[in-house]
A protein has these predicted regions:
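Glycine-rich phosphate-binding loop and adjoining helix at the ATP-binding site
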Residues: 49-73, 77-84, 90-144, 184, ...
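Glycine-rich phosphate-binding loop plus the immediately following alpha-helix
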Residues: 114-134, 164-201
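Short glycine-rich, Thr/Ser-proximal phosphate-binding strand/loop in the N-terminal lobe
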Residues: 5, 16-63, 96-98, 163-192
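A short, acidic, amphipathic alpha-helical segment used as a generic capping/interface helix at domain edges
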Residues: 198-211
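Anionic-ligand binding region
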Residues: 143-175
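Short beta-strand scaffold segments in enzyme catalytic cores
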Residues: 35-39, 89, 136, 154-159
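Short glycine-aspartate micro-motif
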Residues: 25-29, 82-84, 145-149, 219
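Glycine-rich phosphate-binding loops at beta-strand->alpha-helix junctions
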Residues: 34, 209-242
Length: 274
């Protein structure tokens, strides 16, 4: 793809005809155990309460979408102008390719962003991996920054000088004695091994990631970050669990054109909202 065509694509993403100003962004954070949502202003400030419900089981696409519609009803009295989705699986071009923590038998090439957007009247939508969306809220925009989320599974994301380096999927790679990151430091591992052993595993994982990525900063998020009890290295910090929602604003207001190159083109065609 030529530089010229990339530039044109970036321009079309940010100024598509008919797309409203992104001043009421519905941000959705889909997790293995919970679904969360809030309405954000363009600067990331919350314009509604943050609402949450357990993830339905079985977590089929239709069940997740139906549950989300019920969840967000109280906070969208005024319709959202844009939709941001963080999803715990492999996402390409607003389509879920796989989602082991929700059930790969249900999640194979599922156009989830379009499914949710259609229920909201065709609102422009973007969807990325949930660790990537959390990272957009946490990063400082300088050097190599990595994100590790500790929840049902283990999510990862990587940024360079504020630019998302997309699709870093370490969760199902082996990390210790044949166990994957999910199996080693996911929630099932914490419950089985106990917090003390799990903390030692997370501490070991931080060292492994430092060797792997040689990061300048590591941001740790997710619900299980609250269970960390050891002293973190000076270049490692825990971020608010709300970051998974707050990063949704950055999908529509990236801090630089560098970030925009790695964001999916939204689901609308030019003039679709006219």
């Amino acid at each position: 793809v030529s530089t010229e065509s990339k530039t044109k694509h970036r321009t079309r993403v940010s100024t598509a005809k008919g797309a409203p100003k992104a001043d009421r962004i519905l941000a959705i954070d889909i997790g293995g155990t919970g679904l969360k949502a809030a309405v954000l202003a363009e600067d990331g400030e919350m314009k509604s309460e943050r609402v949450r419900v357990p993830t339905p089981r079985p977590a089929t696409p239709d069940a997740v979408v139906d549950t989300l519609m019920t969840l967000i009803e109280p906070i969208i009295a005024e319709p959202p102008t844009h939709l941001s989705i963080g999803f715990p699986g492999v996402v390409r071009d607003n389509v879920v390719l796989t989602a082991p923590n929700l059930g790969n038998e249900y999640w194979y090439r599922v156009p989830l962003a379009d499914m949710i957007a259609a229920r909201l009247g065709g609102v422009p939508a973007r969807m990325i991996n949930d660790a990537e969306m959390q990272g957009l809220a946490a990063i400082e925009g300088s050097g190599i920054e990595m994100v590790l989320t500790l929840g049902t599974g283990a999510g990862t994301a990587l940024f360079r000088d504020g630019e998302l380096m997309p699709h870093l999927e370490l969760a199902h790679h082996p990390v210790s004695k044949g166990r994957t990151y999910d199996e080693y430091i996911g929630n099932a591992a914490r419950e089985k091994a106990g917090n003390k052993r799990w903390n030692r595993r997370v501490e070991k994982t931080i060292g492994i990631l430092a060797t792997l990525a040689n990061y300048d900063k590591l941001w740790i998020g997710g619900g299980n970050a609250a269970h960390l009890k050891f002293d973190l290295p000076p270049n490692v910090a825990v971020v608010s669990n709300a970051a998974g929602i707050e990063g949704g604003a950055k999908l529509w207001h990236p801090r630089s054109v560098r970030e925009t190159r790695q964001l999916p083109h939204f689901n609308q065609r030019e003039g679709a909202l006219s």
